[in-house]
Amino acid sequence: MGSPVHRVSLGDTWSRQMHPDIESERYMQSFDVERLTNILDGGAQNTALRRKVESIIHSYPEFSCKDNYFMTQNERYKAAMRRAFHIRLIARRLGWLEDGRELGYAYRALSGDVALNIHRVFVRALRSLGSEEQIAKWDPLCKNIQIIATYAQTELGHGTYLQGLETEATYDAATQEFVIHSPTLTATKWWPGDLGRSATHALVQAQLICSGARRGMHAFIVPIRSLQDHTPLPGIIIGDIGPKMDFDQTDNGFLQLNHVRVPRENMLSRFAQVLPDGTYVKLGTAQSNYLPMVVVRVELLSGEILPILQKACVIAMRYSVIRRQSRLRPSDPEAKVLDYQTQQQKLFPQLAISYAFHFLAVSLLEFFQHSYTAILNQDFSFLPELHALSTGMKAMMSEFCTQGAEMCRRACGGHGYSKLSGLPSLVTKLSASCTYEGENTVLYLQVARFLVKSYLQTQMSPGSTPQRSLSPSVAYLTAPDLARCPAQRAADFLCPELYTTAWAHVAVRLIKDSVQHLQTLTQSGADQHEAWNQTTVIHLQAAKVHCYYVTVKGFTEALEKLENEPAIQQVLKRLCDLHAIHGILTNSGDFLHDAFLSGAQVDMARTAYLDLLRLIRKDAILLTDAFDFTDQCLNSALGCYDGNVYERLFQWAQKSPTNTQENPAYEEYIRPLLQSWRSKL
């Protein structure tokens, strides 16, 4: 029998003391951290409410996530379902509204480690695509958990390309029913969360066939499991898709439908209807059915994707002031690794972009709320820009947050590879966001189509076609352009107008270049589809630069609103400057390409950038403290507020089942190996 690890009695003295190396970082504050937290929360009242909810959540042992790193897939699923169950009980007892802030704060406190998250997506889709009658019928059933619903769109053979979905919904006028069917193996619904074990109903996206004509993708409410004993209903083949990189708490599933019949009323009908005789009535645009995806993407940005990078920054920054390595001077003690410029270069751009993304997500949410109401009232004028912004920001944020979290993990050295650091799970969660709700390359190319259309609109002669005004996000396409950057010294690159103009210049050039390549191919005889395919790399580059411009512009506009907070405005401006200049240095070839920047100016930008690293260093811990994540929410041995990294890491390691159970390989393999060698000695 293998012996348990030797247990050292640490007591809890260390857990009541602040590590001096992190305490010193908080001693001299150049700005009010609490006030910045209030700004990030959208007001002091929201901060107070969030902390109240977090206090409630963390007071219940049912919500503990501390053993997550040692659990099996089944244990994670059951624990997540337990949390979902108890959240519903608390919400009902305390009167938390389904759309209120409290449930969002509870989700944040638990790091999203809760079951039935796709149930909420179903509700969003119902409210976006359903008629008032359908909402009145199904919404209360969802709210009271009389049914558990999922959103079944992605298939085994198709994902982001929605027009290629194979599941069919054929209308039978004789019975006034839709026959939902998976005609091929690749038509199997694959990946929907809550589908594998939990859901009783699914909102199935399928190709509508009525009166002999295919009408494109529409949404149908389909019962899939018995409400009596949870067994699959007739015609339903259903299960879990198996192991994944992460999200063990979520039962991602598969669904095959074999001529399953649902009533005519189960097709969501806000934007399209099928009359009893099979007549198809179109009430919206072809893009109307994409509205639920827009809703989900906007919510993902601030609710799912961005907080993960923020957590990674908190963990890596705190660990970097505790970890000491080598000496800056031979006579000095070992230095905090955050005092090394190379560590600052790894972490500060991630911190800067997390703030840039925060302010962008806030402005996008405001635009979405205004546009969403208009769309539900049949005003689709905002939809093109809303779609372009939501797809572009989802692609950019998931890409940069994934890269940023991985950079934070590596910046923590070997300990960053331990699950107990919390960082590996953050990285793998973010990795999924690069493909769920739209694969990023495809999303960038959807933005590119919007950019091409917008650019061509600027080239129309005033009298040819009635010109609608450009969308605000691409208004820079008609702004006066500078041929050369006017910067003459490093400090000039700290001017928001200068670097915003620089990003706009490069974006315009790349968009124009992509259009010209497209036109050259079509004029030489290529059809539009082939010409597009042959220029997608150029379009992709243009879309990415446009998205970066949007983040820079959004950050500068957010700073302008902080005139009454000079200390906070100053420290955030440094992050804004760093974000803009880091992007310029990373993509310097794009700025040098047409000599907009000279080599000497790139050197100036680098000088400004390196000086910003030095200035941000003194506020780094405070800027991450402002995110205000609880230790329970971070669930990291490296990132706790008190800085007692090594004590916590050692204590947590002792909880591993491998240290308390018998060695399963000792009797069968290790002992015989050792004895065989002894017999030869």
From Swiss-Prot:
It is found in: Peroxisome. Pfam families: ACOX, ACOX_C_alpha1, Acyl-CoA_ox_N. Belongs to the acyl-CoA oxidase family. Oxidizes the CoA esters of the bile acid intermediates di- and tri-hydroxycholestanoic acids. Capable of oxidizing short as well as long chain 2-methyl branched fatty acids. It is linked to Congenital bile acid synthesis defect 6: An inborn error of bile acid synthesis characterized by abnormally increased liver enzymes, hypolipidemia and low cholesterol, vitamin D deficiency, elevated plasma and urinary levels of C27 intermediate bile acids 3alpha,7alpha-dihydroxy-5beta-cholestanoic acid (DHCA) and 3alpha,7alpha,12alpha-trihydroxy-5beta-cholestanoic acid (THCA). Serum levels of phytanic and pristanic acids are normal. Clinical features include liver fibrosis, mild ataxia, delayed development, and cognitive impairment. Homodimer. Coiled coil: none annotated. The modification N6-succinyllysine is found at K66, K137, K453, K561. The modification Phosphoserine is found at S3, S9. One of its GO terms (molecular function) is fatty acid binding. The modification Phosphothreonine is found at T13. This is Peroxisomal acyl-coenzyme A oxidase 2. GO terms for biological process: bile acid biosynthetic process; fatty acid beta-oxidation using acyl-CoA oxidase; very long-chain fatty acid metabolic process. It comes from Homo sapiens. GO terms for cellular component: cytosol; intracellular membrane-bounded organelle; peroxisomal matrix; peroxisome. Keywords: Disease variant, FAD, Fatty acid metabolism, Flavoprotein, Lipid metabolism, Oxidoreductase, Peroxisome, Phosphoprotein.
